[in-house]
């Protein structure tokens, strides 16, 4: 279990004070895969580095398995960190050591005997799918294989918590998915708590049980993945959800798009559907109710946390009054509608 209580972090550039984290409060239950998402500079990397005290909070508490890390001596902190594994975007493997020896390093530093090390490393390499790579060197591995070695090394001391700092950002989509599947398997088999940070909502959608959204060093929104996708409360949450869907406006429409309605133009709208609104026949309802035609240019549908969500870009053909009434009807039925402009 991880508790982050009233955490603030201040950095200084000369005399300038930069508040990187502002009063962050999170509770991460044991065995959960918890995602923290934010854009570059949002403070998410600073937050995850505070969890194992690579960065000490300026104020607040970091409690892992009942122990407040901010109260520990350096010696106590070194011992406690063995219970917290961490992997990074860059794999940080030692190029002069084999795969086996890279994974063995934490065990050697902990003073384990040779037979214990051999048993543990063999078990971990099998877990991460590298049972045949004991004697390989990092230079002979793919990016995904290097990250698997890093994961095995992070698990060597049997931690209860695994921190993942943009662990898939340097990988291609197929390799990213395989690493996420491995993390899910590790979570399931070992009941290890995983805290990961990312700037990709696709990662959150694929693996996380709960998610927190951070912007400008502040906690913007948090909840189960299903709740966030079904009922996003902030514009930042909407932006991240939109990023998971492939929705584009044809170039010829973009060229004809006007900022204001003029004679002969019609509104182009983007609609976001979540939860029950996905299955509701709202397009046919507004077509009948307000005597308008709906031309769908693009749409996409996906699932996250057991919840369906979707987006649509469409042109509405009616008079100005009926178009406005139809848009208001959609909003009353919990559809987020944005008028992108008017097509001439």
Swiss-Prot record:
ATP binds at residues 38-45. InterPro entries: AAA+_ATPase, ABC_MetN_proteobac, ABC_transporter-like_ATP-bd, ABC_transporter-like_CS, ACT-like_dom_sf, MetN_ABC, MetN_ABC_transporter-like, NIL_domain. Its EC number is 7.4.2.11. Its main location: membrane. GO terms for cellular component: Gram-negative-bacterium-type cell wall; plasma membrane. It comes from the Bacteria. GO terms for molecular function: ABC-type D-methionine transporter activity; ATP binding; ATP hydrolysis activity. It catalyses: L-methionine(out) + ATP + H2O = L-methionine(in) + ADP + phosphate + H(+); D-methionine(out) + ATP + H2O = D-methionine(in) + ADP + phosphate + H(+). It is found in: Cell inner membrane. It is a peripheral membrane protein. Part of the ABC transporter complex MetNIQ involved in methionine import. Responsible for energy coupling to the transport system. The complex is composed of two ATP-binding proteins (MetN), two transmembrane proteins (MetI) and a solute-binding protein (MetQ). Belongs to the ABC transporter superfamily. Methionine importer (TC 3.A.1.24) family. This is Methionine import ATP-binding protein MetN. It comes from Vibrio parahaemolyticus serotype O3:K6 (strain RIMD 2210633).
């Amino acid at each position: 279990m991880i508790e982050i209580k009233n955490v603030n972090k201040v950095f200084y550039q000369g005399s300038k004070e930069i508040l990187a984290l502002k009063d962050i409060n999170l509770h991460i239950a044991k065995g959960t895969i918890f995602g923290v998402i934010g854009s570059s500079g949002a403070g998410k990397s600073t937050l995850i580095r505070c969890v194992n005290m690579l960065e000490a909070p300026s104020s607040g508490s970091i409690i892992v398995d009942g122990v407040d890390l901010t109260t520990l001596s350096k010696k106590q902190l070194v011992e406690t960190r063995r219970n917290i594994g961490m992997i990074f975007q860059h794999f940080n493997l030692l190029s002069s050591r084999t795969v086996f020896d890279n994974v063995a390093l934490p065990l050697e530093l902990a003073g384990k005997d040779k037979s214990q090390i051999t048993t543990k490393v063999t078990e971990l390499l099998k877990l991460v799918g590298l049972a045949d790579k004991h004697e390989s060197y990092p230079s002979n591995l793919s990016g995904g294989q290097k990250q698997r070695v890093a994961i095995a090394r992070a698990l060597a001391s049997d931690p209860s918590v695994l921190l993942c700092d943009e662990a898939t950002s340097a990988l291609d989509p197929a390799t990213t998915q395989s690493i996420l599947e491995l993390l899910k398997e590790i979570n399931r088999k070992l009941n290890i708590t995983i805290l990961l940070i990312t700037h990709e909502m696709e990662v959150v959608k694929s693996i996380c049980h709960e998610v927190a959204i951070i912007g400008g060093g502040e906690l913007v929104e948090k909840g189960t993945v299903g709740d966030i996708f079904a009922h996003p409360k902030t514009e930042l949450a909407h932006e991240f959800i939109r990023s998971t869907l492939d929705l584009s406006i044809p170039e010829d429409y973009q060229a004809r798009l006007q900022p204001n309605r003029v004679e002969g133009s019609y509104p182009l709208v983007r609609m976001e559907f979540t939860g029950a609104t996905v299955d509701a026949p709202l397009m046919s309802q507004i077509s009948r109710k307000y005597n308008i035609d709906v031309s769908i240019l693009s749409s996409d549908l996906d699932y996250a946390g057991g919840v369906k969500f979707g987006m649509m870009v469409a042109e509405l053909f009616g008079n100005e009054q009926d178009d406005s009434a139809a848009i208001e009807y959609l909003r009353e039925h919990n559809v987020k509608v944005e008028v992108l402009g008017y097509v001439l």
